[in-house]
Amino acid sequence: MTATADKQLQRGIVQSLGLRHPKRIVMPVERPNLHYSVLPTAHVTDAILRALQKTPGKAVVFCRLRARTESLAERLNRAGIPAAAYHAGLNREERSRVVQAYLSGRIRVVTATSAFGMGVDIPDIRLILHDHLPTNMIDYVQQSGRAGRDGETAYALLLFSPADFLRFHTRCQQIRVQHKHRPFTQYALIQREWRPYRRVLRFCLQAPCLSQGISAAFGQQSAPCGNCSACRSGAIGKEIPNIPRMTVQELYCWILQLHRDELHRRNPHQKQATNAQLREIAETMQLPDNLPGRETYFPYLRAFQSHP
């Protein structure tokens, strides 16, 4: 039994267990009481603070790194929001203290890695935030689904910045270096990384309804929820005031800037050539379908091409 298994994972489970014609009971992943929003922003921490100020009750902020959980908890405490970090680097006693403080109301927010929630059932979490782009939809649905288990209205806000794309690009570059003499292996590994990541990008930027997008990721269908940021605005979420959201063109520009900085850090002699390439790309920014260098350097930008 699992709460989040798409069709591919279901096939894998059946194959691993050697089952023949098993009876499958699949329930809808749709959560009508959970309102989803996505927001690309250059000011992730500010957006987290504003979301917490706007939404009362218990909250969890999922972070990619342990160090980020610690620094963010410190930042929230300085802002007057009681918080504590939770990650696998803490011993069992320390993790238990955080959970007990959370349950008792001594802290309002847990900043956590994916380790939080395993074996912990807290029904009255009102807000789940992600300060990064998840690498696949299964992880996102598992983590965001920890909100509103009591059936009351709850919220899930996914924040992401171009630094997320740089991390993905860096991972692809590592694969290319590690398997430079095995192009077929290189291609297969990059595609394995890219496919689930692309689904998350399309969910964030192109889903007409985020709840529908989650259902579709699991091979299901649902009606528009009417409550998510896509249903309310027809575009990427705008509901947090005074946090400048990023347009798709700005995302392009920032990704390219980060890419140039990374190349220069590794080899300063490449800077001029990269600048020339960036100028050429910037001149055609209004024509993303014809973006020079996209196929060579930025294949992951393909997810943006049909977004207005």
Enumerate the predicted regions with their spans:
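A structural signal for well-ordered alpha-helical scaffolds and beta->alpha junctions
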Residues: 6, 41, 45, 193-197, ...
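Helicase motor core with emphasis on the C-terminal RecA-like subdomain
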Residues: 1-184, 195, 220-223
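Helix-turn-helix/winged-helix DNA-binding modules
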Residues: 120, 206, 269-273
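C-terminal accessory regions
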Residues: 192-233
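Anionic-ligand-binding alpha/beta catalytic cores of soluble enzymes and soluble regulatory domains
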Residues: 189
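N-terminal alpha-helical segment
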Residues: 30, 121, 193-196, 210, ...
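Accessory DNA-binding and partner-docking regions appended to nucleic-acid-acting proteins
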Residues: 166, 178-183, 193, 221-308
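A general alpha-helix detector
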Residues: 33, 124, 196-200, 213, ...
